[in-house]
């Protein structure tokens, strides 16, 4: 279960307003006449400093004693060029704050700037209404990177550190938030040599903050979808009308789209199960074949020894079975069980093929038509395999090394992301371990009860647009 974020604490300068280039440029210009060695780059360390520490640093930089006269000189330099703060307010700031407030999150501002400056900025930008808690660094003896300002703000909010998402940018600010025990999201700014290594999360825009809060501090970079009962309704294969637009919006928000299905890619293509949908990768056949950007990244084949045992088992029992190779599917026979099973998933009956030479074939998955009573004998003949039942007389059979969760791990490795950065959607028994493993597991409203118990969140059914509703719930679209 993702951690619950209850409050978001913002730094001001460099976060809500793009003030750092303005402040530093103005100060450098006003000081260079008297102190020509002062450059914009030499002033970078002042970003995030408190109003107490800043003049002392500048005295050292200007190679003069720190005196009231020098402090007055700095103040006069700052006053020489008035700043119109609404012009440097980040355009995404207000919509982001409105969304966070609508989500019921507590908001606070903790800035190293003097309180008078904070109130001026918030007042001129029309943001005062969003921050019932405002804390200034001038209230404390120690400034950032000391965590006191954030610990005090958390206490004012009545929240534990793990319930707080802190949005920072500067080296000192990130260090202060991390030392306070909060979850720190660092806003990247390539213009400044900030050390943001202590931050657990990194964002390119404030517009990412609502999703981080809704997802419990997880930055979702990949979404895995079961097909039947998740993207489309089971049996009828009906797709919700809003689904294509929802998935397109998800991709535009930087999330990779991947399938995680028990189906063979041929079924999806030939039956036109997902018209108009495009995916970046897939774990097919319950993770037996994994592809990323059209290239295989992992595969598990059933061994020749297991296939020989299966051959003997089928000859002995007369059961029907479907065989899934890389580029084809076929059955050994058609009987009432197979007809009923294919009708259950709304898929055509595959062509027939002899079992001669079965041991030499590259088989990824099997679909034996066996009852629960017959299943133990099959597994005894194939000890390196496991089954997942999806009907009264039918199972999926894969290697023990397979499984949707194994496929997701292989795909995450190929993408260079962690499991924690994933969200997965499913409804069936073969989805349970996948939902337990993903950063966020979402069960459809039509899911099996044991699958719902394994999920972090339960959405509505396929027919009720459950998938799109879940994406909205987690602010991913």
Tell me what each language-model feature is:
Residues 2-44, 219-223, 227-275:
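Active-site neighborhood of HAD-like aspartate-dependent phosphohydrolases
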Residues 37, 57-95, 103-105, 220-238, ...:
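Metal-dependent phosphoesterase signature
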Residues 69, 241-337:
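Active-site phosphate-binding/coordination module
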Residues 27, 93-123, 177, 247-270, ...:
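Substrate-recognition element of Asp-dependent hydrolases with the DxDx(T/V) motif
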Residues 159, 309, 313-434, 446:
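Conserved acidic, metal-coordinating active-site core of Asp-based
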Residues 4, 82-109, 115-119, 236-255, ...:
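Short, acidic loop-to-helix structural element flanking the phosphoryl-transfer center
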Residues 86-87, 108, 114-165, 171-175, ...:
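Substrate-recognition "cap/lid" segment bordering the active-site pocket of phosphatases
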Residues 197-222, 240, 380, 397-477:
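Mg2+-dependent phosphoryl-transfer enzymes with acidic/Ser/Thr/Gly-rich catalytic loops
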